[in-house]
Amino acid sequence: MNIVFSSDKKEYNTIKKGTKILLAENDGFNQNIELFVKFQDRPEILINKRKKQIHIICREISHYYRALNYAIHHMEEDEFQYQEHVCFERNGLMLDCSRNAVFTVEKVKFLIRTLAKLGMNVLMLYTEDTYEVEGQPYFGAYRGKYTKDEIKELDAYASMFGVELVPCIQTLAHLHNALKWPGMDKIRDSADILQPE
């Protein structure tokens, strides 16, 4: 697939790798297609396919991936036009990563790709004690936790797909699982609340 941009080249570098990833997920997609992409300020997604050319006009990177996903699933048609008005500036999903165990990094990446294909641009990771805290081994004990490097990796991956990663980190309360362990008395106020200094 040849991608031609009629707008700023910075978007090209951002979506080139993500486009390859999404196309690789669609087995059998090896069509010789020219893809023309233009970013605009209006909250619309426009797709126009004529034979071996697809024109996509959109506002955000995640909208581009929604349009690309639509085009991939309508490739058997010689020609089509599709238009959609984007109703929300921010639209996405919150994953609760504090119930039993955290999602693997690969599963979160899969969900990021899915959100992009749906045109969504926000992923919130709700974490109570499932993140790394230096010197506090009981955070995420026996449940898993995200390291700083994993959160950075997920943030970079999400950015490539136009998705904002928002780590919703509990820093004062809802920490029952971490504070139940011996040795946490110095920082515990009550069963699930930290003692601020």
Task: Label the predicted regions.
Residues 1-88:
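Contiguous, structured surface segment used for ligand recognition
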Residues 51-197:
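Feature activates predominantly on carbohydrate-active enzymes
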